[in-house]
């Protein structure tokens, strides 16, 4: 499914996205009609070329005990293309200036100001960080419970010659960043979190 009926972002399901990428990569001659129509849509001008030859790639996974959404991004030539997970079966494809990335990440990670009591770091094994955002809820839910978190997120950002990764948890105890080298979840302010997200592209 590729939905071009509404203004703004293009909505599609995972199979529609795969068909769109395949048509852009191999040519639209044998592609489904909806993929051909999407490639001709002005909203996708310059989008597929960025996705097929990016200077940098990002992935953000946001996961609670019962739900998990994955968001992806591609950056090249001053254009940021985002594929946002609305539901597991519904995606939203759009392009935006790279300067909007920090605000987008803040919204997707649900970062917000809060008044919290004094907090202390908590032990959490580095080997279990993947479980916080695992596709398997049987691993994810107990890991989140052990971390005393309502949800977790993992941001991965890769570019030619390097990459960065950050795992965080959030909930009643506020935002905490994972520091795998010491096996701890460390409380941070939302201001600090925003600053970190604002520098995610600094090395590209």
Roles of regions detected by a PLM:
Residues 1-204:
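Short, surface-exposed polybasic-aromatic patches that bind anionic ligands, especially phosphate groups
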């Amino acid at each position: 499914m590729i939905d071009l009926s509404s203004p703004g972002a293009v909505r599609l399901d995972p199979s529609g996205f795969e068909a769109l990428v395949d048509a852009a990569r191999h040519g639209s001659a044998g592609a489904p009609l909806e993929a051909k129509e999407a490639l001709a849509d002005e909203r996708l001008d310059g989008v597929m070329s960025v996705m097929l030859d990016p200077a940098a790639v990002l992935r953000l996974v946001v996961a609670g005990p019962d739900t998990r959404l994955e968001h992806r991004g591609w950056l090249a030539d001053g254009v940021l293309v985002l594929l946002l997970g609305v539901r597991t079966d519904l995606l939203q494809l759009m392009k935006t200036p790279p300067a909007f990335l920090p605000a987008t990440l803040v919204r997707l990670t649900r970062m917000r100001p809060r008044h919290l009591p004094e907090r202390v770091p908590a032990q959490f094994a580095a080997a279990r960080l993947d479980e916080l955002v695992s596709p398997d809820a049987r691993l994810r839910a107990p890991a989140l419970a052990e971390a005393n978190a309502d949800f977790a997120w993992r941001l991965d950002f890769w570019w030619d010659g390097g990459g960065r990764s950050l795992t965080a948890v959030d909930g009643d105890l506020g935002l905490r960043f994972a520091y795998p080298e010491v096996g701890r979840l460390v409380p941070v302010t939302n201001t600090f979190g925003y600053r970190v997200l604002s520098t995610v592209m600094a090395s590209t």
